[in-house]
Amino acid sequence: MSIGKLLSNGALLVDVLIIGAGPAGLSTATGLARQLHTAVVFDSGVYRNAKTQHMHNVLGWDHRNPAELRAAGRADLTTRYSTIQFQNSTIEAIRQVETNQLFEARDNEGHSWYGRKVVLATGVRDIPLDIEGYSECWANGIYHCLFCDGYEERGQETVGVLALGPIANPARALHLARMALRLSESVTIYTNGNEQLAKEIQQAAEESPVGASGLKFEARPIRRFEKGDVAKTVIVHLGESESKTEGFLVYNPQTEVNGPFAKQLALNMTEGGDILTTPPFYETSVPGVFAVGDCATPLKAVTPAVSMGSLAAGGLVAQLQAQALPEFRLDQEL
């Protein structure tokens, strides 16, 4: 089975260009392969969970390295199916060729690739806190998701929640704190110098049906984080000289969609900075462009990414099989 149509300029035309080879992109490719549709999956080698040794809450893959899942998915696609090609390169630009309703993607080596549809599975970049030591502790003591991490450190005496950035409001801070309380005897909520926010969170906790039992509130500025010597502990240095050791910290950071493609294609975005899509097939505001995985949902985890990719494949298949292949003309440049 051919992996695409070779054009007169030497470029490859496939049904779908998939930008990203994480769980979402691989899942999309699998669905397309099952209907003998052609696709190129572009793998930049950049993954949000690259620092993570184990993934969790993934059926059948619990406590396995996420690299194993990616490798297995890629192996399935290359050994069992013949219509999917992988390209280890970074796409730098995408545009729609208006004259023929195709899409052109250009990689970091100057090669052009053409597809009838595009799937953005680029993932996101976590925006770090501007506090010394944060990056060293990220994913190794500071966790963004307590379904993904934390269970292995259960039974702590104390853990911390950082009510900063997107978590700097009572509802989100208390949600994470209550999840953390399942794994620890007490939870300290840090507001990094914001005394008013600390009061608001405390008041909301005390007035809630479950109360504030087990919760502590720390409004002093955080000077720096330091990785502890034991397990996933993090030392939080406060004010001038005091410090507190936590079993681990919880913080869900602001994220930024990887790549320039949302801007290049003029896609609509959500208030949270994700690509806006329409379920159940996750097509964006530009017809023919789909977005799946972390770049298109606030629920940034492996299982939702796989689900989104599978559903997007269903939408892609329906469109591809209902639309005639447009005539191809090379009359525009990026």
Curated annotation (Swiss-Prot):
Keyword Flavoprotein: yes
GO biological process, one term: cell redox homeostasis
Cofactor: FAD
Domain of life of the native organism: Eukaryota
Record protein name field: Thioredoxin reductase gliT
The keyword Disulfide bond belongs to this UniProt entry's keyword annotation: yes
UniProt GO molecular function: flavin adenine dinucleotide binding; thioredoxin-disulfide reductase (NADPH) activity
Knockout consequences: Impairs gliotoxin oxidation, leading to unchecked methylation and subsequent significant S-adenosylmethionine (SAM) depletion and S-adenosylhomocysteine (SAH) overproduction which in turn significantly contributes to hypersensitivity to gliotoxin of gliT-deficient A.fumigatus. Results in altered expression of over 200 genes involved in many functions.
Keywords assigned by UniProt, alphabetized: Disulfide bond, FAD, Flavoprotein, NADP, Oxidoreductase, Redox-active center, Virulence
Cystine crosslinks: 145-148
Cofactor annotation comment: Binds 1 FAD per subunit.
Associated pathway: Mycotoxin biosynthesis
Subunit structure: Homodimer.
Database matches in InterPro entries: FAD/NAD-bd_sf, FAD/NAD-binding_dom, Ferredoxin-NADP_redctase_2
Gene of this entry: gliT
Coiled coil: none
List of residues binding FAD: 21-24, 43-48, 56, 91, 121, 294, 301-302
Family: Belongs to the class-II pyridine nucleotide-disulfide oxidoreductase family.
Enzyme Commission number(s) from the entry: 1.8.1.-
Induction: Expression is induced by gliotoxin, but appears to be independently regulated compared to all other cluster components. Expression is positively regulated by the brlA and abaA transcription factors. Expression is also regulated by rsmA.
Function: Thioredoxin reductase; part of the gene cluster that mediates the biosynthesis of gliotoxin, a member of the epipolythiodioxopiperazine (ETP) class of toxins characterized by a disulfide bridged cyclic dipeptide. The first step in gliotoxin biosynthesis is the condensation of serine and phenylalanine to form the cyclo-L-phenylalanyl-L-serine diketopiperazine (DKP) by the NRPS gliP. GliP is also able to produce the DKP cyclo-L-tryptophanyl-L-serine, suggesting that the substrate specificity of the first adenylation (A) domain in gliP is sufficiently relaxed to accommodate both L-Phe and L-Trp.
Pfam families assigned: Pyr_redox_2
Enzyme class, spelled out: oxidoreductase
